């Protein structure tokens, strides 16, 4: 290392060194003029002193305080310090020459070069953050060299003593850093001094305002090889930056915003890293050390390098604190387990995936011993907090999502404490999700919650039948979840075989329809009817359906078919034609009821019924017409003379000359918010309404195979006629329009079955304007 003697900043030299220089001046001012050329250590005794005309060493003993201050590995090297003086001559004449200020500066430089730069790495490490010793040796916090066992990451440049005026404000430090970073970006090779930002002050600096956008971009420019030791980043914003091979030892990063900040191959030992709660995305630490660093409980440590911890005391923070060890890292804990602390520290399901549980678990698997030890310390803290079941209840899911998995299941202490927690969690799942769909499982749920539920059903096999709704959902998601492991799928299949063998289940599967048609599941295809749900009211009733059908009924779309299943009673198939889906779901299979009702409320056909059949004048008919929309077939028929006459009295005024009256047409447009819609949009809606009234007139609802209510046929045809007037383009062809019209009226020998007409029109609408059809046609008719 070259040191410019004239560039030493005297303010950085310890006072004891200044005193030493003063002492040297006093010893040499009497009669000697000298030129100081070097300072060196030696154990060699002086043979000669003050020989004029020759190089002569002058021996001075370093004060003990200086030796104690620098603490080199071998203190004997400071026992004697020799200053070589050239061309000493007698100057007893007047004007005796003292050592000049320039020579004093050179003595300072030489002393620092020998005793600081070359020998006292310990001092550099503790006081300035200079590089550790070569060969994988670093210096621990107790000033003892330690071998890192290959875990110490690449480090930033060592201390430079080149003189520069230190910036006086955070803004000046920011300007200096911007200049250095831009020079590096331009391809300039920076010196160690250029990259030395130790003791810098970046408080309240938003780095996105001082650096080009390329440094905040994904895979953008990198801040590489800088020394930020002993620096202050409090309240700064370093979000989206990438620091590589940088040193942050002894720096303060309190309340710093570091969303998506990357620290790679860096030394972040002895750092206060309590970043701001406004940090949205966790910072990442890749091949980075955090020895004795204080970390918030919401961090991702997946790339951290751990070393062996030593017996140092926990860090001191304002307001006090409670801490646990995670390897050689310190994790902050709450002083008391209050309700807010339980939620903030443990509930990652409520805090964007962040908790102390996830922080510990984020370490690589090779640190399983350290992870288990930290979790045991956490459990001890929770146990000592004497938390009630009510306090633990909101975080049961978060707790089992981590602690019910390896390696923590290897700990007897954790298993014993977690057992009751897992039992209460399972009971709550059974109570909550037996009658309603589970949330659509994401990766977290598939990998962390489903295996826990499988384990709970394995321990409590009776729950498979008593809570068939939940059990079948769990098996369904285990078999179809893309993020479920093969082990999870294998365990799910094995548990389902146990379920099928249960006396309440087995009578329903030997009918030549289940699974592979011989009573066994066929998991090779999602079309096989592998699932059998037991009625929540009657053990003799069961529903058999395929994987795809079960999935879509739990998470329906407007096109979902609600009758694509087998209904079993005492092992025999039962027709669903006369069964109302809503009643079936309400009574026997409530797991589908909420989804069915939610889809049903999006169907707006009933608004037209309320226009035609007001509850004040036609309350009974109104209820009959609406009730008929809840089933595929109705036992109520309206073909007797009294019914035909009553319907004619209601519908004839709406159809003067067989067409929709202008006033009634405007009522329809208003009810369906079509007043300002395009003619095509209006036509599509009228077409779908016509389809529904064709269904009313058919044998499936109010008609029979040989007769149907004329008023309903006429109204259906009038709706279709108006749709044709508005937009003929929505019809397949003019010939098809004429054919449908003839069928409604029985003209030209056309087949008059309106059930056929309704089906044909419905298929056309589903193909060309499905969203309109799905918003109108009753769900049971879809």
Curated annotation (Swiss-Prot):
Post-translational note: Ubiquitinated in the presence of host E1 ubiquitin-activating enzyme, E2 ubiquitin-conjugating enzyme and ubiquitin.
Record has Transferase as a keyword: yes
Catalytic activity field: S-ubiquitinyl-[E2 ubiquitin-conjugating enzyme]-L-cysteine + [acceptor protein]-L-lysine = [E2 ubiquitin-conjugating enzyme]-L-cysteine + N(6)-ubiquitinyl-[acceptor protein]-L-lysine
Range of residues in the leader sequence: none
Top-level taxon: Bacteria
Coiled-coil residue windows: none
Cell location: Secreted; Host mitochondrion
GO annotations of cellular component type: extracellular region; host cell mitochondrion
NCBIfam families attached to this UniProt entry: PRK15377.1
Protein known as: E3 ubiquitin-protein ligase SopA
Organism: Salmonella dublin
């Amino acid at each position: 290392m070259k040191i410019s003697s004239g560039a030493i900043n005297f303010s950085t030299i310890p006072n004891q060194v200044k005193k030493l220089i003063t002492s040297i001046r006093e010893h040499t001012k009497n009669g000697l003029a000298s030129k100081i050329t070097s300072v060196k250590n030696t154990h060699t005794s002086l043979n000669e002193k003050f020989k004029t005309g020759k190089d002569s060493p002058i021996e001075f003993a370093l004060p003990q305080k200086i030796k104690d201050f620098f603490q080199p590995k071998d203190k004997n090297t400071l026992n004697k310090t020799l200053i070589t003086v050239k061309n000493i001559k007698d100057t007893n004449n007047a004007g005796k020459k003292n050592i000049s200020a320039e020579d004093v500066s050179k003595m300072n430089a030489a002393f620092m070069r020998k005793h600081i730069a070359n020998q006292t790495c310990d001092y550099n490490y503790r006081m300035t953050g200079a590089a550790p010793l070569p060969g994988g040796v670093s210096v621990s916090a107790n000033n003892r060299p330690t071998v890192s066992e290959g875990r110490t990451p690449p480090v930033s440049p060592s201390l430079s003593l080149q003189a520069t005026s230190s910036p006086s404000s955070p803004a000046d430090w920011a300007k200096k850093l911007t200049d250095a970073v831009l020079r590096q970006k331009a391809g300039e090779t920076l010196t160690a001094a250029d990259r030395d930002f130790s003791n810098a002050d970046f408080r309240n600096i938003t780095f996105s305002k001082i650096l080009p956008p390329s440094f905040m971009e994904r895979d953008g420019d990198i801040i590489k090889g800088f020394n930020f030791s002993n620096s202050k980043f409090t309240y700064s914003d370093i979000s989206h930056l990438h620091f590589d091979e940088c040193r942050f030892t002894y720096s303060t990063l309190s309340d710093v915003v570091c969303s998506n900040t990357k620290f790679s191959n860096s030394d972040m030992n002895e750092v206060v890293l309590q970043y701001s709660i406004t940090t949205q995305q966790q910072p990442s630490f890749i091949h980075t050390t955090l020895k004795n660093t204080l970390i918030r409980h919401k961090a991702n440590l997946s790339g951290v390098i751990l070393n062996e911890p030593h017996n140092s005391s926990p860090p001191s923070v304002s307001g006090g604190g409670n801490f646990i060890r995670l390897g050689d890292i310190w994790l902050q804990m709450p002083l008391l387990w209050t309700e807010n602390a339980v939620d903030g520290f443990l509930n990652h399901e409520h805090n964007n995936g962040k908790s102390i549980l996830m922080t510990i678990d984020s370490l690589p698997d090779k640190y399983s011993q350290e992870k288990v030890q930290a979790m045991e310390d956490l459990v001890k803290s929770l146990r000592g907090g004497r938390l009630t079941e009510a306090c633990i209840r909101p975080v049961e899911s978060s707790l089992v999502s981590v602690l019910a998995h390896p390696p923590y299941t290897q700990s007897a202490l954790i298993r014993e404490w977690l057992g009751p927690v897992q039992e209460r969690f399972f009971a709550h799942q059974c109570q909550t999700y037996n009658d309603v769909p589970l949330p659509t499982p994401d990766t977290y749920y598939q990998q962390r919650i489903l295996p826990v539920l499988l384990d709970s059903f394995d321990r409590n096999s009776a729950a498979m039948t008593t809570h068939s709704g939940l059990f079948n959902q769990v098996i369904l998601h285990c078999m179809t979840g893309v993020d479920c492991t093969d082990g999870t799928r294998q365990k799910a299949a094995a548990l389902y075989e146990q379920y099928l063998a249960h006396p309440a289940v087995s009578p329903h599967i030997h009918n030549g329809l289940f699974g592979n048609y011989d009573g066994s599941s066929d998991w090779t295809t999602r079309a096989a009817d592998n699932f059998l749900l037991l009625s929540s009211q009657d053990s003799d009733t069961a529903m058999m359906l395929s994987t795809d059908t079960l999935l879509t009924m739990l998470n329906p779309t407007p096109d979902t078919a609600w009758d694509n299943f087998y209904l079993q009673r005492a092992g025999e198939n039962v027709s669903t034609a006369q069964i109302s889906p809503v009643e079936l779901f309400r009574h026997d299979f409530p797991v589908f009821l909420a989804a069915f009702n939610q889809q049903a409320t999006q169907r707006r056909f009933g608004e037209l019924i309320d226009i035609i059949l007001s509850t004040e004048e036609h309350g009974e008919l109104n209820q009959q017409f609406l009730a008929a929309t809840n089933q595929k077939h109705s036992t109520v028929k309206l073909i007797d003379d009294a019914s035909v006459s009553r319907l004619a009295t209601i519908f004839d005024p709406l159809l003067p000359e067989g067409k929709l009256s202008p006033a009634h047409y405007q009522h329809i447009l208003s009810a369906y918010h079509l007043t300002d819609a395009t003619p095509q949009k209006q036509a599509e809606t009228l077409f779908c309404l016509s389809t529904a009234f064709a269904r009313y007139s058919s044998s499936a609802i109010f008609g029979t195979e040989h007769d149907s209510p004329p008023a309903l046929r006429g109204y259906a045809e009038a709706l279709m006629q108006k749709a044709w007037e508005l937009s003929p383009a929505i019809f397949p062809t003019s010939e098809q329009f004429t054919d449908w019209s003839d069928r409604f009226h029985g003209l030209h020998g056309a087949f008059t079955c309106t059930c056929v007409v309704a089906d044909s029109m419905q298929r056309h609408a589903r193909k060309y304007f499905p969203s309109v059809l799905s918003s109108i046609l009753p769900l049971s008719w879809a």
